[in-house]
């Protein structure tokens, strides 16, 4: 009898966790294979959220790499303008960069969602921690479902960049980015980076991310694919200034849970022993990067408890944060 109770509890706990699929093999066809593993029927017009890469950047996910998932879903690449100077700051310059980076080659469908800033609209954030609304581009309304395609790497402001960063800063319009960076103080990008605490900023990111997930879950569905390749401590926003990656390529992860997929990626980095690991972990800790995950989880859009399923072995590794070393322990142990 006791054996059956233990088995029941184990199965119940496993069912409460989100599935995160993983493969070590990074190629275009595996982007499709990983999406197929989710067994998710996305409805209507599918947006493929990407980072189009700042000028001079070498590490962003290239449109040629994403071609197969683009073809398979009959999707449209979607992106927004930025809240800092650079070629993605204005729609006209951003369109030039799209051409330079190949996003418009072969008649690829690529849309700048906030190309007309005057047409921005707001999404209400339920039970906000820091901000009660999210400002997004008008073309978001053109899409019924979405796959968020994220290059997992460090980030000089958020600590790291993954699915939740794409959902928050990535989906926000230029005014929305200023709103998040300032934790709800201003929509003016020139005033957005003045005196906001990291906890307030990362909390605002978690708030904003929740509104996008709820928006698509209430329409045609949403999925997430993180690619752990060229893992630099800097974001693709840094362009040519991004330092060389010091962490080896790890693989592709996919999930319907943005909290679980980002948590799984960070757990993999924690257990890594490459020379750049400690520097990235310290950055994430210093910039309160994990707070974004915590706030997103509080919103109920996902869980930090997950089952990591290695599709190369078809093995459920069954990992969760309770089994993992903390950031502080990892940094300490790495220095031993």
Map each language-model feature to its residues:
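Sec-dependent signal peptide recognition
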Residues: 1-7
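A general, composition-driven signal for non-globular sequence regions
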Residues: 7-10, 43
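Bacterial Sec-dependent signal peptides at the C-terminal "C-region" and cleavage site
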Residues: 9-18
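Extended, low-polarity segments enriched in aliphatic/aromatic residues
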Residues: 17-72, 76-336
